[in-house]
Amino acid sequence: GAHAQFRVTAHQEGWDRIPPQAQKDGFWFQQSVLANMDDDAAMEEVMLFGRDNGHYPTFDLFKFYYVIVDNYTKEIQYISDEIYVTDKYALTVEDRNNDGISELYIDYFKDGKFTVDERGYNLRTTRCYDRIEWSPESKNIKPQQP
């Protein structure tokens, strides 16, 4: 199926593969996936870094960001400018437009804002969905609003 070309890397593997400048202070490597994110044959490793951002009776919150690293040269090709807030870690890398190049799909709370009731239930937030993909014009990877 569509996921056959992706290999999910276990949490504890590969700390040595992380370029030091990829790790922001207080964030930890959570998971990664290898995929072809641009027009050359070398694979990229899409890394998710995160940290806890609060625990509630029915859900947990996390802060996270992404880094896309050339798997061969270990150069950072993309790093999130912003830190996102979410209630689940998700690393969704798929080639939905079938052009042979994968895109990173992310969802997060708009402006990091959310509300709960006084008992910590009833999470309300506006979810944003972005697509981060390689752009031939600029020869790099950049976020797109869908």
Feature-to-residue mapping (PLM):
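Acidic, small-residue rich beta-repeat scaffolds with periodic aromatic anchors
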Residues: G1-Q23, T92-P146
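Acidic/hydrophobic-patterned starts of short beta strands in beta-sheet-rich repeat architectures
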Residues: D39-G50, N98-Y108
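Short glycine/acidic-enriched loop and turn motifs that connect beta-strands
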Residues: R51-Y56, K110-F114
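Short coil-to-beta strand junction motifs in C2/discoidin
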Residues: F59-F64, R124-T125
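Short loop/turn segments that connect beta-strands within beta-propeller blades
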Residues: N71-Y72
